[in-house]
A protein has these predicted regions:
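Post-cleavage N-terminal segment of exported redox proteins
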Residues: 1-50
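Hydrophobic cores of alpha-helical transmembrane segments in multi-pass integral membrane proteins
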Residues: 8-27, 61, 69, 206, ...
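Membrane-interface interhelical loops and short amphipathic "cap" helices
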Residues: 30-51, 75-79, 87, 95, ...
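Soluble extramembrane regions of membrane proteins in the secretory/endomembrane system
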Residues: 31-230
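Short linear interaction motifs
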Residues: 51, 62-66, 267-277, 317-320
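Short, charged/polar low-complexity linear motifs in solvent-exposed/disordered segments
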Residues: 88, 97-98, 353-355, 362-364
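Membrane-interfacial, low-structure loops and terminal tails that flank and connect transmembrane helices
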Residues: 257-282, 358-361
Length: 415
């Protein structure tokens, strides 16, 4: 270790700094996360949503594919809309219509410009004002907003069911018919969508920006990029480019001597090393890797086709069995699996070479056990994805065995 002491200390120092930053900002994410109110209620005492119903709604959203079907707060697939941005915009338009009917007896589009400006200003104030009370856990909404929420929820209830009026919309969004069959779970999911929109519109205490830092862009309530958005967006690019430039400069000018071109060996060194039992056992890993890679490529074409025909494959309605959210899930997960399996196989192949051409104790047994563990994870997670999106799996099992809905971490938590 003596020759590499400086490098070891450099590596340890880098790890300490980076993991300290990761831990600090990871804790900050939880500390500054938007609160989930115990109740969303009106001044008249009507309870619209509760803490538990919002979380149940999140589970319902995860079970239909989560980020693989639209997105939340901008993180996910965009074949369907971002549900936060879409809900917020629709709710705002509904608020304007409800308020106009109450104040003027006609839709918002039919009142004069001065009256429209007054209602827009009232709406902006109402939506950006934080009515959440941390002591009681209650967030209050006006009766006008409650009616707007109900009208917005009705649209989503029809969208995620099989209402004929929204068939073309579902096709454009690559959603299967009756995406979420249970009316109760659809209502819960609406609560989750509302909460994400509430956080996107409500100002964080002590600031003039919302909990999501004024995301999404929504001119109706003044959601525009903050100064911090602009500064840190530019700074991140500048720092990245400066870092790359420093690395190039350091490599070119800080080295004490040029490295000599390596001389190729006369013979392939691997061909002179007899394979150990554990290395021979790695052959089945290659079949798994090739199978997953082929599966990923085929699913990539299948997924891309859904952008043309949202529910069909060359005229055949396959969405009831293999909807867009499922094949996109499998497409991404199969890529992660074959890449991870390839790294595992490479590392396991090199271990005996590093060990002087001999297998470490129980190496072959470990290779075999790990392979079957991979098979169980792949088959189990794919089956769980299917059963969740098909709404066959019980809701309470979805998180652990079905679909977590986080795009690159879709497999159930147990897997």
């Amino acid at each position: 270790m003596g020759n590499y002491r400086k490098l070891w200390f450099t590596l340890i120092g880098v790890l300490i700094v980076t993991f300290s930053l990761l831990g600090y900002y990871g804790a900050e994410v939880y500390r500054t996360a938007p609160p989930i109110p115990d109740k969303i209620a009106t001044a008249g005492g009507e309870i619209l949503y509760t803490h538990d119903s919002i979380l149940d709604g999140q589970t319902a959203w995860q079970s239909v594919g989560g980020m693989q079907l639209g997105s939340i707060w901008g993180h996910g697939a965009y074949q369907a809309p971002d549900w936060t941005a879409d809900w917020l915009h629709r709710e705002l338009l509904n608020w304007l219509d409800v308020a106009a009917e109450r104040a003027h007896g006609k839709p918002f589009a039919d009142i004069d410009a001065a009256a429209q400006a007054v209602l827009r200003d009232l709406m902006k104030t109402e939506y950006r004002t934080n009515t959440y009370n941390p002591e009681t856990g209650v967030a209050m909404v006006s009766s006008t907003r409650a009616d707007a929420i109900a009208k917005t929820a009705l649209y989503y209830d029809q969208l995620f069911s099989e209402a004929p009026a929204l068939h073309k919309t579902r096709e454009h969004f690559a959603m299967k018919e009756n995406t979420l069959p249970s009316a109760e779970r659809r209502a819960q999911m609406m609560g989750f969508f509302f909460w994400t929109a509430w956080a996107a519109a409500t100002e964080r205490p002590g600031t003039t920006a919302t909990y999501t830092n004024n995301w999404p862009h929504e001119p109706l309530i003044g959601n525009k990029p903050t100064a911090e958005n602009m500064v840190w967006s530019v700074m991140s690019v500048v720092v990245m480019m400066a870092g790359v430039g420093f690395l190039v400069w350091g490599w070119a000018f800080l080295r004490k001597h040029d490295e000599a071109d390596p001389e190729p060996p006369q013979h392939d060194p691997l061909s002179r090393v007899p394979l150990t039992p554990s290395q021979r056992a790695l052959g089945k890993y290659l079949f798994l890797i090739v199978a997953l890679f082929s599966f990923q490529v085929l699913l990539g074409g299948f997924t891309a086709h859904y952008t043309v025909e949202g529910q069909q494959f060359y005229g055949i309605d396959v969405s009831q069995w293999f909807p867009y959210s499922l094949v996109r899930t499998w497409h991404i997960q199969s890529a992660l699996f074959w890449i991870a399996s390839g790294f595992l196989a490479a590392g396991l192949f090199l271990a005996p070479l590093i060990n002087g051409g001999k297998d470490p104790a129980y190496q072959k047994l470990g290779v075999d056990i790990l392979f079957w563990a991979l098979v169980v994870v792949v088959v189990g997670s794919f089956a769980g994805n299917y059963l969740a999106i098909a709404q066959i799996m019980p809701p309470e099992w979805n998180f652990w065995l079905g679909h977590q809905g986080y795009e690159y971490v879709d497999l159930g938590r147990l897997w």
